[in-house]
Each structure stands twice: as C-alpha cells, then as structure tokens.
C-alpha cells in the first residue's frame, strides 16, 4: 500500500505548521499444512517512507515462506524456567509494552509500574531506549508534535536507568512536569502523549553468539494475546518459536506461555545484539533475558 499525506496544524496560540508524509508498505502471509492437519502461518513485511528503502518484494515473500515452513512439526515443551532470546520483532513488541508505561497519561492515571521510579536503575547497563522524532526518513519523524511544540530526542532509559516519562501539555500540567514535545493526535482526537521513533540501542554481539550462549532455552518469534498489566508490570503472553539445545536451534515450539515481571525482565537482559532492525517506527536488536517462566505441558 502507498499513501501520500500532508499534516497541518493551526492552534489558538498562534502556531501554524505543516509537513509532508509518505508511506509505502508490503506484507506477505504464507500458510502451510502440518502433518496433523493444523495450519501454520507466518508473515513478513516492510514499511518505509520511500520506495528505495523498501525490502525487495521477493525477499519479503521468501522470509514469510521460510518462517511458515520452519514451524512445521512444532511441539510443546515442559514448563520450565530458562533463558529466552527475543528476535528483533519480538524485542520491538516488548519495548512497546514497556514504553506504554512511560507516558504522562499512564502516570497521572496511576496505571504504571514506573511511578515514582524516575532516576532508578531498573534494567542492566545494556538497556538504553530513546524516542527520537528527528531521525531522517523514519515513520515517526516530525518537526513539531500534535500541539505545535518543537520535538526533541528523549532518552527514556539510559544504561538501565529510567530517565522519565513522555508528556504532552495536558499530562505535564496534571503531574507538575514540562512537556517533552510528545503529543500525538488525529483529526478527530484530542492530544495524548506517545512515542515517535523508538530505538532500543544495539550492542556489539552477533545474534548467533547470543543463541550460542544458551544451553536450554526458547528463541521467541511469535507473541499472542495482550497479557500485560502496566500498573504492576506483570507480563504473560502466548508464545511460539524454537527450542535451543546446546547453543543450537533444535525444533519449533508452539502453544507455550512466557511470563515474568517487567522490571525483573529488564534486570535480566544479559545480551543485546548488533542486529538493529526497523519495524515501522520502532527498532530493536536481538535481546536475551536470563530467565523467564515458559509454561507448556
């Protein structure tokens, strides 16, 4: 799909501004029959601001087909506590859940486990997450926010320390803070704070080495459901992927659940890959969490 748009904002404080926005995206889904008759499906996509950045359509199809075929013969595993390696797309999902707790609206509603924790070291030194609306050519890039405030780069986590929340003018006023230029809005919606381009800063470890450091564990490629409580940080999601044995991918895994607490998960990130990958306006590398509960048989 393609879209060409123009965002313009005029407000009662005398602000006038506009900027163009283009998007192009392609998604491919593949379906295969397993030996027991179950349907296995996988997909891949590419979404960019310009055509020259879009992944080759043939490559998108090949990745979708491979991700589907690799699931054939998937099975459950016994309940255990093991390391879990998040592929980049799954790391982006985890980051999205986390940053949803770092908005001013979550703070003033009392719906975040990060309340009263600004400045606290919650994650390992490998955890650095930024929201950067000034990156050239990215989906969330914009010169001003939904209230006409000049945008800026905001470091949400730096070397494991939680730096603070993303605010628009309203939530900043409600909580006694200053706006971070993070207001988002639609044509018919009121502003609310949210991220622009989220980046989990990569490390320097190849993903193969991260997997190779696991004796027994899960390589996560699928998450299902919405089992995350932002107020408490309790995390529980349906999951699938591949079992790791002696540092190698052994077999596909399905119908399991992974669970933990978000702050404990951040404190358990012991490896961050060099493979930073973009998915829309968010980017993350491979991550490894030292231990999560994998519930299966």
Each PLM stretch: what is its role?
Residues 115-297:
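Dual-mode signal for accessory low-complexity, basic/Gly-rich regions
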Residues 9-15, 91-99, 231-235, 294-297:
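Short glycine/threonine-rich loop-to-helix capping motif typified by GTGT followed
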Residues 3, 32-37, 158-159, 244-246:
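Short acidic-glycine loop/turn motifs at beta-strand connectors
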Residues 100-124:
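Amphipathic alpha-helical
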Residues 1-24:
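Hydrophobic alpha-helical hairpins/lids featuring a short glycine-rich hinge
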Residues 21-98, 102, 273:
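Internal alpha/beta scaffold segment
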Residues 25-26, 43-51, 102-111, 171-186:
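Extended active-site and interfacial segments that coordinate phosphate-rich ligands
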Residues 1-6, 81-87, 120-131, 135:
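Active-site cores enriched in adjacent His and Asp/Glu residues with nearby glycine-rich loops
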């Amino acid at each position: 799909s393609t879209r060409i748009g123009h965002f313009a904002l005029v407000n009662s404080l005398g602000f006038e501004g506009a900027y163009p926005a283009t998007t192009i995206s392609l998604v491919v889904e593949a379906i295969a029959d397993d030996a027991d008759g179950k349907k296995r499906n996988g997909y891949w996509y590419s979404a960019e601001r310009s055509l020259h950045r879009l992944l080759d359509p043939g490559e998108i199809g090949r990745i979708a087909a491979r991700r589907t075929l690799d699931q054939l013969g998937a099975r459950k595993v016994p309940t255990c506590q093991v390391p879990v390696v998040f592929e980049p797309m799954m790391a982006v999902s985890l980051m999205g859940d986390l940053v949803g707790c770092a908005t001013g609206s979550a703070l003033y509603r009392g719906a975040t486990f990060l309340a009263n924790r600004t400045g606290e070291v919650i994650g390992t030194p490998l955890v650095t997450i930024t929201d950067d609306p000034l990156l050239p050519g990215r989906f969330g890039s914009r010169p001003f926010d939904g209230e006409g405030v000049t945008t800026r780069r905001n470091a949400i986590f730096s070397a494991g320390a939680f730096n603070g929340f993303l605010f628009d003018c309203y939530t900043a006023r409600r909580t006694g803070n200053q706006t971070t230029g993070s207001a988002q809005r639609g044509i018919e919606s009121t502003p609310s704070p949210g991220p622009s381009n989220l980046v989990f800063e990569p490390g320097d470890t190849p993903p193969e080495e991260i997997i190779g450091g696991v004796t027994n564990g899960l390589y996560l490629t699928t998450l299902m459901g919405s089992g995350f409580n932002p107020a408490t940080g309790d995390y529980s999601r349906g999951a699938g992927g591949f079992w790791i044995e002696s540092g190698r991918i052994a077999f596909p895994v399905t119908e399991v659940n992974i669970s933990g607490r978000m702050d404990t998960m951040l404190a358990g990130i012991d490896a961050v890959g060099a493979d930073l990958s973009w998915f829309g306006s968010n980017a993350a590398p491979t991550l490894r969490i030292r231990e999560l509960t994998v519930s299966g048989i």
